């Protein structure tokens, strides 16, 4: 049988202990916590070397078999579900931190390095990186960088992909290439001034190559942390007045914070560990909770930063904004990496967690949160929305989070509809979807420059003419 032939060829490359076509294994790689429909791969393969990946990609080309890169299936968004079958290539055993260069300020990691592993090793040397927010420490670090994810230092340094300094990638023909300055220099310190080809990989969801090494900026780790909290006391129907959005922009422009984040009341209750169904929001509690986090290398520096932030909040209150300070003493004790995703997936029971995340102008959060509340209300769900301002302060993450019961078909169908309506809200607000499932990409392309879509297809066809790399992604 053809399947037996392929199995034997795969086993020749990685060893029989690292390949499986048994149903119970395939099922584990057929889905994730989102509502994206499951799809069985034909094989699961675990690679441990770059050379193995090259051989696997060449085999996939020869046999016209799809190949989907994954890191232990720890990434949400349905992006590693093998929609056309084929091989799921699990890279979690390639988990070495190859270099931490303190003199130049970067680290080089393999794709299987976890969030917790990277943080622990860097902490020993007094450094840190912008860690993906939400996933547990056991989740892969690399996906949150190459898919434009958000990190806990995003208010100071921007989205995670902006921290990438270089990469090594296996291209769809099996060739190995370095991208960024490391293609010329022995050091992985910057992606320019050479032609920046990382755009052929970043955000492409594994459809143009497999990243085998990633260079990331590292920063000295401050010893001291402070957090200032405030609530926005408005109504569910008009949750974020434009005046409050402009206050957030002003606070971000002060350039004192590493993170400015907000949550709807319902999202805060999940963070507190409360389960579905939630009681109605008490009138005395805010519609939105916000906090600003800053760090410093000395207590004196921290005190100055915290005081300025507190004074800005006081100015907002005295100017008549509907805000008041909130106690964030306990929350300030929480350190990265967090386990928020686990709390969300357990909120309604059944382990389901879907979301649509975006980068959206902060000034348009006013209409965005209002309309997202309407979507949640329409389907009988509590509004769970997270907000974070990126470096530059004028745009940031607006993400609708949808915990659901995977065993409840009504829940599943409701969340699928909510996700699609959420995409429309975000696009109406001028936002862009990150980690976008195919249906969200299709909606973006409908509104976009048709020649941009033509170029995407041309790049994909040029790099991957046999269409083996994670086919069915990006609405292409």
Q: Across the structure, where does each feature detected by a protein language model lie?
A:
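Glycine-rich, histidine-containing beta strand-loop boundary motifs that form or position
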Residues: 69-73, 91, 111, 131-135, ...
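Activity-critical C-terminal alpha-helical subdomain
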Residues: 435-476
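FAD-binding subdomain of flavoenzyme oxidoreductases
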Residues: 97-100, 109-111, 115-246
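Glycine-rich N-terminal segment of FAD-binding domains in flavoprotein oxidoreductases
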Residues: 23-26, 30-94
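C-terminal substrate-recognition/cap domain of FAD-linked oxidoreductases
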Residues: 231-421, 435-440
